[in-house]
């Protein structure tokens, strides 16, 4: 049961992080995959893991 709770919290944190990152990227007029440290380090897949990288 504890493991499930930990996983749920991790997913919520990562999702919030993804949304914040996406907002930050669009504010700067950049998109996932373009060269920018905040906007995903050059790979659209990395965009979703920018907070853990």
From Swiss-Prot:
One of its GO terms (cellular component) is extracellular region. Expressed by the venom duct. Keywords: Disulfide bond, Knottin, Neurotoxin, Secreted, Signal, Toxin. Residues 1-22 form the signal peptide. It comes from the Eukaryota. The cysteine framework is VI/VII (C-C-CC-C-C). This is Conotoxin Cal6.23.
């Amino acid at each position: 049961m504890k493991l499930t709770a930990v996983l749920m919290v991790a997913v919520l944190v990562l999702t919030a992080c993804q949304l914040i990152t996406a907002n930050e990227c669009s504010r700067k007029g950049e998109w996932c995959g373009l060269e920018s440290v905040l906007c995903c380090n050059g790979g659209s897949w990395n965009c979703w893991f920018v907070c853990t990288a």
